[in-house]
UniProtKB/Swiss-Prot annotation:
Cell wall formation. It is found in: Cytoplasm. GO terms for molecular function: ATP binding; UDP-N-acetylmuramate-L-alanine ligase activity. It comes from Sinorhizobium medicae (strain WSM419) (Ensifer medicae). Its main location: cytoplasm. The keyword Lipid biosynthesis does not apply. The lineage of its organism: Bacteria, Pseudomonadati, Pseudomonadota, Alphaproteobacteria, Hyphomicrobiales. Pathway: Cell wall biogenesis; peptidoglycan biosynthesis. The keyword Manganese does not apply. This is UDP-N-acetylmuramate--L-alanine ligase.
Amino acid sequence: MKMPKTIGLVHFIGIGGIGMSGIAEVLHNLGHRVQGSDQAESANVQRLREKGIRISIGHKAENLGDAEVIVVSTAIKKDNPELIAAREKFLPVVRRAEMLAELMRFRNAIAIGGTHGKTTTTSMVAALLDAGGLDPTVINGGIINAYGTNARMGAGEWMVVEADESDGTFLKLPADIAVVTNIDPEHLDHYGSFDAVRSAFRQFVENVPFYGFGVLCLDHPEVQSMVGKIEDRKVVTYGENPQADVRFHNIRMDGATSIFDIEIRRRRTGQVIEIKDLRLPMPGRHNVSNATAAVAVAQRLGIKPEDIARGIASFGGVKRRFTLTGEWNGARIFDDYGHHPVEIKAVLRAAREACQGRIVAVHQPHRYSRLSSLFEDFTSCFNDADTILLAPVYSAGEEAIDGVNSEALVNRIKAAGHRDARHISGQEALAPVVAKIAQPGDFVVLLGAGSITYWAAALPKQLAEISGNRA
């Protein structure tokens, strides 16, 4: 049974979150009554208000009003006053992924999973379905630049969603097509072991119906290992690997544009389809790989090669994925969400491919627990940066861990052989340092999942003020 329209007023606790806001927006567009609360004003809160959704700032029991259904994310603590009030009223409390699953039942669904690259790949799949005239509904974990939002209601029969594996609830999503970009040891606080992470992703793919299929990256060792274990489900592989069903090759760069060819091989018939000279307006092998995942989905849905090429060429990117925030003295300043060593390494490698000058990486580590568990990986992920500026850890509410901090990481990076790694005290120290070292042609790349995005937005103006020029 599909979710009826008569469920009553739906209240989102933490409605401004990137995942929650998208679900709230689509529910609203479907005709449901929606309201919510959040701790602070934000762009997402403002956008939802403009659509007519009532939002309270601060969490108070009275915010519930006449709500009959409560939606929460894993970020909401058990002592939240609205959650306590909801349970006292015996109201149904629904996890974010459960509500997303209900929305997916209205459409044929494509779920994009993986430790890294989900948001960009979700956006690319949506772009190719758009180019093919399929007009999908989209719920993403980041702002899609072409839409100006992370969610969009389409008139077509397909829905494209980002599947968040962090708390295991992605296994509730009723996907017809499941994409896995990679599998790394993340979220071990929830899973307990890497083997449990592996098992969850295998189940994610095997959950698709017999008429669906999985799309798996053959370049990632963990995913390739999983391919051979998938039972009784169709699998399409992709990547640079010569054995992949959908293979990218012949990559070259034109400034910040990646040019590449794709070869699609049908296992049963032996048919080979080639799409040459695809132009993706983003640098980086990882972005070409994500685009190839989108091609693997699109070609199976019957989208023509010329529409695929057009969709890739017009792809507008995702906010906080190598987003240009401004220029100063010929140096370009970028904002990126990368906060895991694998992501940081990929972003800096892409920057190196596109940049004619030097790379200045500014990183704000996100969570003491992540820095502690991946400390050695962090020491080697900045190799493509000529200069590294490390800010204090963004705690995200965690307690500090003795010996786990940015100063210790700087020392370890230097000991591992990096020529120029420095610690900065915070945002106020950033612009003066960058003003001294950035030169025309350089890229200054700010990386992290915390408040560093605001630093990236402010930095061009701060640099202009230092130099006495107007931005």
